[in-house]
């Protein structure tokens, strides 16, 4: 079979507060996040947005210890996966490629090229496929493969999604069952699945399978759990004025509180690692919303991280991928060329569609004013000492 590698893909996150601003710059410099009519404006606008948003985002990260634990957890997952593959008789080197922070996907690919692999399995750490997560990373890799003849010699295969893998479902069910034991009446606790949202247009216009996979996954987890608990699925992290997948997590929590639900177990279904959306958004923001709605006992299932059943599932996916016909970049969904994309981070873009348009116009005017001040050396930012 030759030398085998596994490339784990994820979003990435700032490891310390000083990383937040450049992380945001990378996020908004991605043309899949903000599409402009003039490409040369992409990076200047990303600089402006990241500068304006850095302080608020830093405050959120400060609430969870000053940075994202995502890389540390992903490294632990990679190490555990390497060990599990060895036990299965498969010698493989595991690489980590993050979309918007170190180690970048490009860095991982350079290491892969240097190691002269014969086989590569590309495994996103997103159970459910979306054009904005796995799809975004796949598009970066596809462009690299297109531009580099040496990469085209590498025998590779993608694992687009794995929301229905029995090992993953069992690991999720095990975690839920453990947390249910903490409630006075475990079978009466309401199970609340919170998935990361995407704009409704991704599903309606681009054919993104994300919503269908999330809904199917929720049903499969409940079937695997085999408990009588009632459950709800909602979508978190909505940004901007456009409609996202519904119901929204905050509204669903308020509705359950009004219905008299006291015991609630939140399951972060989109996330296999602890990061800002679990530690800050769910544990702090949504907990506060739930308590204000009258939900007295708010608990959360931990992310999978290095749960042994989960790691076993990842290893089995890799082994199956090595033995099955390859899945290539051409086989996964691609967004339309003119489709507007939104980041997988939470930023306020405006209250209405008209407000979003005006926000963009004002941002452009602000950017032009900034250029004038930088060239002239005079202006309000110089006066207050910011430049």
Swiss-Prot record:
Protein known as: Ferrochelatase
Domain of life: Bacteria
InterPro entries (UniProt xref): Ferrochelatase, Ferrochelatase_AS, Ferrochelatase_C, Ferrochelatase_N
Gene3D superfamilies: 3.40.50.1400
Enzyme class label: lyase
Protein's organism: Synechocystis sp. (strain ATCC 27184 / PCC 6803 / Kazusa)
Phenotype seen when the gene is deleted: Increased light tolerance in a strain missing photosystem I (PSI); may decrease chlorophyll synthesis. This mutant has an insertion between the ferrochelatase and Hli domain which is expected to allow ferrochelatase to be functional. In a quintuple hliA-hliB-hliC-hliD-hemH deletion chlorophyll half-life decreases 2-fold while the half-life of PSII proteins does not change; photosystem II assembly intermediate RC47(1) (PSII monomer without CP43) is missing. De novo chlorophyll synthesis is very slow.
Triggers of expression: Constitutively transcribed under all tested conditions, probably a monocistronic operon.
